[in-house]
Swiss-Prot record:
Keyword list, A-Z: Developmental protein, DNA-binding, Gap protein, Metal-binding, Nucleus, Phosphoprotein, Repeat, Zinc, Zinc-finger
Biased composition (Low complexity): 49-60, 79-89, 129-139, 399-427, 536-560, 712-734
Gene, per the UniProt record: hb
Predominant localisation class: nucleus
Keyword field contains Cytoplasm: no
Subcellular localization, as worded in the UniProt entry: Nucleus
Gene3D superfamilies for the chain: Classic Zinc Finger
Identification of the protein by name: Protein hunchback
Role of this protein: Gap class segmentation protein that controls development of head structures.
Zn finger residue spans: C2H2-type: 261-283, 290-312, 318-340, 346-364, 763-785, 791-815
Composition skew (Acidic residues), residue ranges: 567-578
An example molecular function term from Gene Ontology annotations: DNA-binding transcription factor activity
Cross-referenced InterPro entries: Znf_C2H2_sf, Znf_C2H2_type
Length: 816
């Protein structure tokens, strides 16, 4: 500071102002702006000396003249050029990165201006670089996430992620002496130049703090996923070890969703297991509380505590036989085994939802208000005795109570037609929605008739054939072809299932299975010998030709009928077409007409003793009481009139045809599923014994005792989706035949001896050539035959070598 007391005033104000301006320009603009930190003391000293000199001797030296503006501008431009040259030098760049001022380039001995502060900053930067490289090297060895150095964003008080690297190595750097400044600073500059490329700039954000280990977080998530479909026995346990971190902190699954623990008594939701256990204790009686000795777990059930203690001890005695999965109880193992199965036991009746777990199925039904479909067993067979209690607390499906089965059978026989039709119409939506569950356990009752077509290419068109009313020509053609057909490839399982009315198998034969049925028939035909396939193809061609011939003959005969017959025919055909269309729309499944029935002995004797057409026409006339009492629609009550007209047409055509055709005509008049004779006999049988399941279709399986009888069972799948069974029996061993109505899915069979009514039923497995006297044993045996390969076990999927290999496999291996 100048001494204002000793200094004298300027000669004039203008001279003093000019002197002050020149002094300000000389002292400020000649010094770099970035160097004011380190040269502040020097500038202050210079200003002080200049002030003192100017103040002490104003008279000895005259005041400097004002510097022209042009001279000041030139000096300012020169200083700017010097600053640009200084920034290009590595020395200045290193100092700028370390946030230290660059020395002035005007002096040649600029290194002398570096003091101990600059040297200390350079050494600290080198040490930071060494620690950074060491951290990266250790990170690569332990396979951790990318760890960074010091994070300036870390709040104070929190542990530094790099503290274990800096804690032991951070020492106060020695202060270099000013005497060794040239040598030490030169070495530091060379080292800084080499490390400049690897040193991160100070304005770049360091790496973030290390995240939590993925391995530690993945284990509880995996355990939580495994417990998602387990039973209620493990509802209090979700992790392998109930340590403090798992029971006192919220748990997140792999999708980032926090797990909640909901009380089933009051609905309170907790986010930690400790809070959930504390709340659960309030609902328990004090004398029944069981508490774990290692954690706050509480329960009222002894087996729950036992499972929990096994988790603490890491004891998992139950192990899967197909993988390395282990668990603490049998319920968890049963839930896990479903993951290895391809059978979806629970299906929705209102949508395509299917699942393996009953709990998930109940949640779906509650959420959308849907109705459950048919429950399947573990092997895929439909089990109508199991029902789903949607809003109940019972685990798994429950069985129906059969206490009132006798009264229900007696009431069924007395039910009126309207009530029966209404009951079946209510069951139709459930029946039509069952998709692809039928063929998981039972093979389809297909046959080697014309619908099989010998190959997949010809079977598929037959499966989608248009619906057409039954005509006499087609019936005659099928009857003529029946004696030459080979025996059935698959047993008539439909008639077997109809014996037990509790096995609601027919709802599965609907439009959804048409393509699958054609593929199943093609797969069966592919296993036959080439000679058998050629024979079937030839028979199909012959049948097609005969059908065309019969249609031509039918057209010629209709033109020769009298006028009154034509009028009656038109009226009856219109009624039949209306009824047939109404049935195809209203009734997707007619089970009442599919019951196999027995012919009365009197009717059999009349058909044998009356060869003439007039007597046969008289015996086939209908009465009012011959119509079926149980039907699904009004169409089946008028089927008798149509049959009478068809019978008259067949008899007239037989009178004009050759004697060979006359011999074949009586077989075509046999009662079928749509005939009133079959319906009347079915009603009589139901009235006599409504709860019995015996039928002539079961007795028609006696192919082993009567080898000379040809049995044909044809199955066709059409777009109508109707399902019916047709069976006929006669005492003539050479005239046994079956008629499959076109446009329906039918399975028919015929018996062949006069003593068939008293003989027991015998069931034959065509694959293994074995006969069964019990329907249950036969059903169990057929459940082991797979759909795609008959000698592959349907339970476990193992392929066997022929029937012997399959039986050995069934005997040696346990199937659950």
């Amino acid at each position: 500071m100048p001494n204002w007391e000793t200094s004298t005033a300027a000669p004039s104000y203008e001279q003093h102002n000019a002197w002050y301006s020149s002094m300000f320009a000389a002292n400020i603009k000649q010094e770099p702006l970035s160097h004011h930190h380190h040269h502040h003391g020097q500038q202050h000293h210079d200003n002080h000396s200049n002030s003192n000199s100017g103040a002490s001797s104003p008279r000895q030296s005259p005041l400097p003249s004002p510097i022209p503006p042009s001279t000041q501008l030139e000096q300012y431009l020169k200083q700017q050029q010097q600053q640009q040259q200084q920034q290009q030098q590595p020395m200045d760049t290193l100092c700028a990165a370390a946030m230290t001022p660059s020395p002035s380039n005007n002096d040649q001995n600029s290194l002398q201006h570096f003091d101990a502060t600059l040297q200390q900053q350079l050494l600290q930067q080198q040490q930071y670089q060494q620690h950074f490289q060491a951290a990266q090297h250790q990170q690569q060895q332990h396979h951790h996430l990318a760890l960074g150095g010091f994070n300036p964003l870390t709040p104070p008080g929190l542990p530094n992620p790099m503290q274990h690297y800096y804690g032991g190595n951070m020492r106060p750097s020695p202060q270099p002496t000013p005497t060794a400044a040239p040598t030490a600073v030169a070495a530091a500059i060379q080292t800084g130049d080499k490390l400049q490329a690897l040193t991160p700039p100070m304005d770049v954000t360091p790496p973030k703090s290390p995240a939590k280990s993925q391995q530690s977080s993945a284990e509880p998530e995996k355990e939580h996923d495994l417990m998602s479909n387990s039973s209620e026995d493990m509802k209090y346990m979700a992790e392998s070890e109930d340590d403090d971190s798992n029971i006192r902190m919220p748990i997140y699954n792999s999708h980032g969703k926090m797990k909640n623990y909901k009380c089933k008594t009051c609905g309170v939701v907790a986010i930690t297991k400790v809070d959930f256990w504390a709340h659960t204790r309030t609902h328990m009686k004090p004398d029944k509380i069981l508490q774990c000795a290692k954690c706050p777990f509480v329960t009222e059930f002894k087996h729950h505590l036992e499972y929990h203690i096994r988790k603490h001890k890491n004891q998992k005695p139950f192990q899967c036989d197909k993988c390395s999965y282990t668990c603490v109880n049998k319920s968890m193992l049963n839930s896990h085994r479903k993951s290895h199965s391809s059978v979806y036991q629970y299906r929705c009746a209102d949508c395509d939802y299917a699942t393996k777990y009953c709990h998930s199925f109940k949640l779906h039904l509650r959420k959308y208000g849907h109705k459950p479909g048919m429950v399947l067993d573990e092997d895929g067979t439909p089990n109508p005795s199991l029902v789903i209690d949607v809003y109940g607390t019972r685990r798994g499906p429950k069985s129906k109570s059969f206490s009132g089965s006798g009264s229900s059978c007696s009431s069924t026989s007395k039910r009126s037609n309207a009530s029966a039709a209404a009951a079946q119409q209510q069951q139709q939506p459930v029946a039509t929605s069952q998709l692809s569950a039928a063929l998981q356990g039972f093979p389809m009752p297909a046959a080697a008739a014309g619908t099989a077509a010998g190959a997949a290419g010809t079977a598929a068109p037959a499966a989608v054939a248009p619906v057409s009313p039954p005509s006499p020509a087609k019936s005659v053609a099928s009857v003529e072809q029946a004696p030459s057909l080979p025996s059935a490839l698959l047993p008539p399982l439909a008639s077997l299932l109809q014996q037990n009315r509790n096995m609601a198998f027919f709802p599965y034969w609907n439009l959804n299975l048409q393509v699958l049925a054609a593929q199943q028939q093609a797969a069966v035909l592919a296993q036959l010998s080439p000679r058998m396939r050629d024979q079937l193809q030839q028979q199909q061609q012959q049948q097609h030709q005969q059908q065309q011939q019969q249609q031509q003959q039918q057209q010629q005969q209709q033109q020769q009928l009298p006028a009154h017959s034509e009028n009656e025919e038109d009226e009856e055909e219109e009624e039949h077409e209306d009824d047939f269309e109404r049935k195809s729309v209203d009734s997707a499944m007619d089970l009442s007409q599919g019951t196999p029935v027995k012919e009365e002995p009197q009717q059999q004797q009349q058909q044998q003793q009356l060869p003439h057409s007039n007597h046969m026409a008289i015996n086939l006339k209908l009465k009012d009481e011959d119509t079926p009492l149980i039907s699904s629609s009004s169409a089946s009550r008028r089927k008798g009139r149509v049959l009478k007209l068809d019978t008259l047409l067949q008899l007239k055509s037989a009178a004009m045809s050759s004697p060979e055709q006359q011999l074949k005509l009586p077989a075509s008049v046999l009662p079928t599923a749509s005939s009133p004779i079959a319906g009347s006999s079915a009603n009589k049988q139901l009235a006599d014994d409504p709860c019995s399941g015996a039928s002539s279709a079961d007795e028609s399986m006696e192919t082993g005792r009567v080898p000379q009888v040809n049995i044909s069972a044809s199955s066709t799948a059409s777009s109508s989706g109707n399902s019916s069974n047709a069976s006929s029996s006669t005492s003539n061993p050479t005239a046994a035949a079956t008629v499959a109505t076109s446009g329906t899915v039918s399975s028919s069979s015929s018996s062949s001896t006069t003593t068939s009514s008293s003989a027991p039923a015998i069931y034959e497995c065509k694959y293994c050539d074995i006969y069964f006297k019990d329907a249950v044993l036969y059903t169990i045996h057929m459940g082991y035959h797979s759909c795609d390969d008959v000698f592959k076990c349907n339970m476990c999927g193992e392929k066997c070598d022929g029937p012997v290999g399959l039986f050995v496999h069934m005997a040696r291996n346990a199937h659950s």
